[in-house]
């Protein structure tokens, strides 16, 4: 009897009101609970067995709110009409339920997951199955709305979007890996290739192209830790005086350097640099002869070089330097900067003594340089 009453209540709304009248006359709470539980059982079976029939009955159930009396709704909460009343869940909770049920339905269509099945059963226990089917029907009918259309479109094309994202990420990762692999190949080829090939590859690679000029600059300035200075232009008289002084001694003391700089109107730094360059040139001409060189002079050999030795047109000939190298083991310099007279007999006969070697200050006239030309 109760099942027939429920079926009548599902089909016709006034018959449902008749069921409410019969239920209080029985005076049994168990029958009311059974009548309330029967729609859930019938709907679950009806939805699993005949989903089309449940969808067809949902539009019939929507006009019920217009004819449902509100007074009967407040009489008892266990009546059939109270459970089947759509106004019970319409005002505030229908929209999230609609989206939630639609999400559950889309999940079931996409994959038969146990979690989605449990969520769908919880919706059936909380709400009426007829109402749930009506909500699903409304979801299909009113899918033209912006929010619901976007949500359902996201649920239906979720797998496609994931595949697209995976493909894009895989392509991006492969591109990055290719670029990194290309950079590693360039680095390996640069490290294994000679200097000529490295120059060609550095023109195509920006970073290597920036590293290459640094290497060139460090190679050019390896002798000096600062930018190159302007080359000093020595006059003819200054060059002759410096050459004659270098013939007498290859290392200058502090006093000799100061006197020579003042006499030639040069700075001590210029005199020191010229002697350093001249010693370097002499060592190249006479390898192995610098071991017996005197070190009594104050000039060091670690200063910056700017290639001033190439300007000297009066470099001594190898025989002259050879004769002077025989007497380099005799340190004959005095603190006053004069050459000792004991060193004069050891000089060769063809080496004419000039006022420069005697420490004289009267060497400005060009007549003194005639014998040396």
UniProtKB/Swiss-Prot annotation:
Q: Which SMART domains match?
A: HOX
Q: Please list the residue ranges the record marks as binding DNA.
A: 227-286
Q: Which residues form the signal peptide?
A: none
Q: Which Pfam families match?
A: Homeodomain
Tell me the keywords, alphabetical order: DNA-binding, Homeobox, Nucleus
One Gene Ontology cellular component term attached to this UniProt record is: nucleus
Q: Where is this region: Disordered?
A: 49-74, 149-231, 281-328
Name-wise, this protein is: NK1 transcription factor-related protein 1
Q: Where is the composition biased (Gly residues)?
A: 296-310
Query: Low complexity: which segments have biased composition?
Result: 196-210
Record's subcellular location? Nucleus
Q: Which SUPFAM superfamilies does this chain map to?
A: Homeodomain-like (SSF46689)
- The protein's role, per its UniProt record: May participate in the energy homeostasis regulation.
Polar residues biased stretches: 168-177
- In this chain, composition skew of type Basic and acidic residues spans 53-63
